[in-house]
Every structure is written in structure tokens, then in C-alpha cells.
Amino acid sequence: LVESEGIVMDRTVSSQYDKMTKTPIEKLIISLGIPTIVSMLITNVYNMADTYFVGRLNTSASGAVGIVFGVMAVLQAFGFMCGQGAGSSMSRKLGEKDIESASYYASTGLAMALIMGLIIGGFGLLFLNPFMRLLGSTDTILPYARQYGMCILIAAPFMTGSCVLNNILRYEGKAIYAMVGLTVGGILNMIGDPIFMFAFHLGTLGAGISTAVSQIISFGILLYMVKTKKTVSKVCLRFVKLSIGMMVDISTIGFPSLIRQGLSSISTMVLNQMAAPYGDAAIAAMSIVGRMSMFIFSVGLGLGQGYQPVAAYNFGARRYDRVKQGMIFTFWLGTILIGIFSAVTFVFTRPLIRLFRDDQEVVEFGFLAMRVQCISLLTQSFVLNASMLFQSCGKRFIAAMMSLFRSGIMFLPLIVILPRFLGFVGVQIAQPIADVLSCIGSIPFVLRFFHQLDKSMEEMNV
């Protein structure tokens, strides 16, 4: 029986290896990218559902969603650090046909994420008021932010854990299973929002409860998918290795994701604080613009996440030609998809903002910001895939630099300086300018790495 199971496992590993290293690159990336794009869009739809339903209450409540978005960004930062770090290392080990090491990375990454979620959730609940203030709450927004944020912090371990399970499935080329878990959670949240908020008369608290419950259910489904042998690598206590070496390895590979998501959280805080002098309507408007921009960005992000396991697997298998070919294909397809969504949003900017909050002041605050963002998002497919390329190939430092560009090095100085000279227009255009500059800054790194891949291929042929 043991021998029979071993033969089945060997066939599974061989089949997975052939799929990731021999399937035509365009077909492979699209097959992995479509479920991930669907997952990302649904995740963003249910985030936007909170914005939509809470927007039915009042402008201050709508602003609270933008404040608590910073909490979710913090949790996702640590969740994706563990998930991307474990997933990238795991996928490269599978490319080398080292299943035991892959299982250690997967199991340890999940354990780290759960522990971090517990710590962040505990401290957040203990210091709830100061935390919400730090994120940019005004006196009128604070009561709503407390209610919504409390629920998110209670569900924190499940949110961070889901990030890892999602990445384990994706990096093994099983994106369809990850899509199921995220989709069910998203649909439940969209159904739960109006029930808890209006049928049970819980308002913002109801939106928080709905989001927390949907996150817990998503975690359960993703864990079930991993535990029912949908993956080659194993996730169990036996493979948890909380040694300094293992945790540092996962953390350093995943560090670019921590930077990307963490700086997104910091950027949201600073953006809210710079918008605060212009009132709750300004905070609500920038929150809506942020959600709409993320919806468009998620199309490219989903496709890029479809490319990640391809890059990691083939880099481990020394198929550098496929790593390079995949990056170029994903960049162009991502730009086209983002362009389509941006064009629609550009044309219907006012009606779309009004859909979330029918307040003329909110619409006017958000109009210019959204339109300029639609144009600048066209540059982000390149930046996004450059960061994912380096992270998947284990190039820690360069991947971290890529992540620093958009939300850190470029954005933070701009959001502090521009409003001093341009007023609220400076708040509106800071992110679009940062997007363009980050794209320009990324180009030399990618060209240099492509040259290194070409050189490695020449040496292998010799």
C-alpha cells in the first residue's frame, strides 16, 4: 500500500512538473491567471460592497471604511509576506523535485501567519481608539471606524492565514481551488452586508460582522482544499519548523510583499491625514477612489499572480527562457486588460463615484483623482510584474526595491509636499505621479536581469 501511494505521488509530482515547465507559456499563464483574476475581482467587489452599503448610511460612515481599509492592509501585509515567502520558496523546491522541503515552507509559512494575525489582532483590540486615530479617524468618523475595525481585528488570524493558503494553492498551479475559497467568501459577504446592516439594524457593525464571518469561512474552505490532498506539498504540524533560519528565509523572500502592502497601509494613513483638513467628504472621496483604483489594479495583479508560480517553478528548473517569455507576455496582456477597465472608468467617473456615495461634494472631490489615476494605472502592469519576477526568482533586494517605488520612495514625499503648494489637487494627483515615476525607475532593473538570464542560457548551451 505504501509503495502504491508512493507511485501515485511520484506520478502527481511528475505531472505537475511537466505542466509547469512544458505547457506553452501563454496557455499556462492564462489558465493560472483567469482564476486568480476572478478571485481578485471578487475580493475587491466584496470590499467595494462594504463601501457601497455603508455609503447608504452617511458620509462619516463611508469615510470609516477607508480608515479600516488601512487595518486590512496591515493584516494583508504580514499575510502576504508569509504567503509569498513560503509560496515562492516552495514552488522553486518543487521545481527541483524536493517535496519535503516544499512541505516545510508551506506549513511553517501558515504557522507564522496565524501567530502574526493573533498578535496584530490582540494589540489592535487593546489599543483600538489610538489605532483608529493613527489611521486617520476624525471625531465624527471614529465611532463608525471602531465598530467596523473591531470585527476585522477579531478575524485577523483567519485573514493572514487565508493569504498563505491562497498562495500555497496558487504557487502549485492550483489557482482554481484558491478561487473557490475566495469566491464563496466574497459572495457571502455581499449577501451578509444588507442582512446584518439593515435587516438586523446593526449599521457599520453589521458590515464588520459580515466581513469577518466571510473571512473565517474563506479560511475554512482554503484549508479544506489544501488538506484534502489538492497540493503536492503537505501542510501539517509535523512540517512546522519555527527555526530562526526557516523563518528568516520565508520573511526575507516575502519581505517585498510586506513592503508593498505595509507601505500601502502607511500611504492610506498619510493620505487620510492629508485629506482630513478638507472634511469627511474628502476622506470618503479618496477612499472610494482607492477602492475603484484597486479594482482596476486587481486585474493586472491577478494576471501577475498567475505568472508568479510559472516564474518560480521554471527558475528552479533552470528554464530561464520561459521565465523571460512569461514576463513579457504577462506585461502586455496586463496592460491591455488594465487599459480596458481604466477606459470604462474614465468615461463613467461621476456615475461610478455616485454609486458609492450620492453626495455632490464627495463626487467633485473624487472626480479629478479618479480620472488621473485611470491614466497612470496603465504603467502599473510593468512595475507589478517586475516586482513579482524578482520575488519569484528569489532576488530579495531588487524585489524589495520594486515594492518601495510605488507606495514609498515616490508616493510619500509627493503626498506630503504637493498639497502644500496645490491644496487638495496635490492630494488627488500624488499617487498618479508616483505610478509613472515608479515605472520609469523599474525599467533598468528588469533589462539588467533579462541580460543575466540570457547569459545564463548561453552558458548552459555551451
Go through the PLM ranges and name each one:
Residues L1-G33, M90-P157, A199-F255, A311-S376, ...:
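Short alpha-helical transmembrane segments in multi-pass integral membrane proteins
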Residues K22, E26-V45, A49, V71-F78, ...:
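Residue-level signal for short hydrophobic patches within transmembrane helices
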Residues S31-N47, C151, G185, S214-S218, ...:
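Transmembrane helical elements of multi-pass membrane transporters/channels
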Residues L41, V45-G63, M132-D139, I195-T204, ...:
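Helix-terminus/linker motif at the lipid-water interface of multi-pass membrane proteins
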Residues S62-G122, M159-A178, A285-T349, Q380-M402:
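Small-residue-rich hydrophobic transmembrane alpha-helices
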Residues V74-A77, N189-P194, F219-L223, F295-S298, ...:
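Hydrophobic transmembrane alpha-helices of multi-pass small-molecule transporters
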Residues G83, I152-R170, A178-N189, A207-G220, ...:
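Short runs within selected transmembrane alpha-helices of multi-pass transporters and secretion channels
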